[in-house]
């Protein structure tokens, strides 16, 4: 009886010690408050939400996602308040019910940690694994002339690789006309832009496996970087037939948040390029995905179609990954939108030279936020 009492006492003491260790400690990196802002670009009306976290020591960190609801913000701030920014991995797990907002919070917490350490985020994460980041220009959907014009603008802005939309099939299993139209599009673009131009063909998960197979065969000799989201991830057997019988690399992943679906693709050897959505997964989660991908010789090219804060996070993520491939970046058509993005977060952030984005050596994410452009506060 006495021994049992002693064991229970020791167990109770151990539990109390663990609880004390887990309790948030006050300090300059303790999160004091959080605010969010809805941002809209002036011409395109592209929308995204920017999160601002501030510590008790006055350090401000920034993150971004697509949208932030007031109720979700209140819930997130309740989780974050009083916690240390260095607990970003733990807090990422505790915000699992708020996937979009936790991605933004993860960026902001790492921004704070980097500023406190007086080091870029990629150094905090063990980088840099590279000193510049290959850039992919996102080309909006349109007819052949519109796509060519957008690619020419992007090339003039420094891009040498492009994510182009596939010509949509007229119907399911469209056959030869669909294949011919896509082959012509890629051939025309390469002829107009130069042999040093590379292309990712974005199918937006809109094709049947049969159409995707026909397209993959037709584009093989044109050497696209990869075929992006050729079909929905509903039948691993169908994707396996597509991946196993063709040479054109396949990219999947923008719809995946949990690791289970990604592990299925890896286990069956169905993927060449992993495309996690940065605005939904955040830096920490994608680094976990990337470690799994590296062990299976799969490259990582995060999906990003948001604002410049997300671009900054993407660059630091890229410079922390050994198996990073390329980073897509939105390219606004309107000069006013380009100026807006440059003024919002820093003029040099999205500047591309000979196909590459530069890494900032500034602490944290290296942002220079103009608060006057943040738009309406979420409340």
Regions found by a protein language model. Give the residues of each.
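Metal-dependent enolase-superfamily TIM-barrel catalytic cores that perform enediolate-based chemistry
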Residues: 131-246
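Glycine-rich, aromatic-flanked loop segments that form ligand/cofactor-binding clefts
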Residues: 105-142, 146
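Conserved, mostly hydrophobic/aromatic
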Residues: 58, 105, 118, 162, ...
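N-terminal export leaders
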Residues: 1-22
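Metal- or metallocofactor-binding catalytic centers and their adjacent structured scaffolds
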Residues: 54-119
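Glycine- and other small-residue-rich loops at beta-strand/loop junctions that grip anionic moieties
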Residues: 65, 102, 178, 201-208, ...
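Flexible C-terminal active-site loop/helix
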Residues: 6, 15-16, 27-39, 43, ...
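Shared catalytic-loop signature of beta/alpha-barrel
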Residues: 71-74, 82, 89, 234-356
